[in-house]
Amino acid sequence: MPASAADLCEFINASPSPFHVCATVAGRLLDAGYAELSEVERWPDHPGRYFIVRAGSLVAWSAGQGVKAHAPFRIVGAHTDSPNLRVKQHPDLLVAGWRVVALQPYGGAWLNSWLDRDLGVSGRLSVRSAGKGSEITDRLVRIDDPILRVPQLAIHLAEDRKSLTLDPQRHVNAVWGVGDKAGSLLEYVAERTGVAVADVLAVDLMTHDLVPSMVIGADANLLSAPRLDNQVSCYAGMEALLASVPHDCLPVLALFDHEEVGSTSDRGARSNLLSTVLERIVLAAGGGRDDYLRRLPASLLVSADMAHATHPNYPECHEPSHLIEVNAGPVLKVHPNLRYATDGRTAAAFEVACQQAGVRLQRYEHRADRPCGSTIGPLASARTGIPTVDVGAAQLAMHSARELMGAHDVAVYSAALQAFFSADLF
């Protein structure tokens, strides 16, 4: 098994929610000597390696000695969230003797893939701190026991056996027991998390697949896991930042929540998160707003998100002249109507980075007769004015509860992003 693929499996297994992704990345950054800063406090005026966390988003950077106040940024951006089934605020139901938890889809979840799976619960609780008046703290939740399951209708009862139509309001609720009254999921979660249910003020809870991530295939060259979209890019960007070496440019890792639902939030790619952090980096180094503004057009951002490999059962769904393979290198994504932010200049820059890393680069275009998804790329580029290129690793079954990629792509994806941080591009 490739070492990087095994490490990615551990990363994904430890990160069932966006909050856990940030906690996992933060832990590895701290182990590497990074220091966490607060957005509401003054930042150090000396070089160093730092990061901030805003709920389910994280930004990290490495400012070495001698980096000029107007030196450009090299940014790898990715997203921490994945499509899933999320717990409603009043989830407890009793239906025909079944204790039911009401769920609803988050993002473009491929609903059929969540049926008949053993599911855990993860996320966070906002709780009243003991002995601290009205202060609120967050507690991460991770229950890996198989407490929930969304059962499929038996084929004998289906009106149409040739197709499957799921109503997101009625057909994706989970059973978790039987009885003569509804259970209390909140009481269960609070007890498992070690807090008093009376101290729980609010919840952000979601479900996750319990089958561990694993390398599969006769030649052990495929990786099966939940949340490949987009924890693979979070992992690869983190590894690239940790391996980055001092350079004239300042490397930044930006991991955003809420990409799967449009990025319009206090911590999404449409927010002020990245632009505020970048400007504060300049100000803390003794520069001014003019120095910050001078940096932006000379900077470069990689929007790192997963890409569609050509599906062997549905090759007709892909652009015939742009067939994408797994274990064949990262994927450059281009769209003439700017569903991706790539242009000729940014594509050339990433090509140079891949050449310096000795990594093959594939090129993807979407079929013109099918709607195309998007990424944080166009949003972050418009918000900051930084030239942007959209890239990713190839995978199958995007937005399913469980996805598939090439095990050898993990290392080359990280290597390409590491080269991007240090290559002379502009």
Curated annotation (Swiss-Prot):
Disulfide bonds: none
Cofactor(s) this protein cannot do without: Zn(2+)
Keyword check for RNA-binding: no
Alphabetical GO biological process terms: proteolysis
Binding residues annotated for Zn(2+), in chain numbering: H79, H156, H399
Keyword Ribosomal protein among record annotations: no
Pfam families: Peptidase_M18
InterPro entries: M18_aminopeptidase_2, Peptidase_M18, Peptidase_M18_dom2
EC nos: 3.4.11.-
Top EC category: hydrolase
CDD domains (UniProt xref): M18_DAP (cd05658)
GO molecular function: aminopeptidase activity; metallopeptidase activity; zinc ion binding
One Gene Ontology CC term in the entry: cytoplasm
Family: Belongs to the peptidase M18 family.
NCBIfam families to which the protein is assigned, alphabetical: PRK02813.1
Record protein name field: Probable M18 family aminopeptidase 2
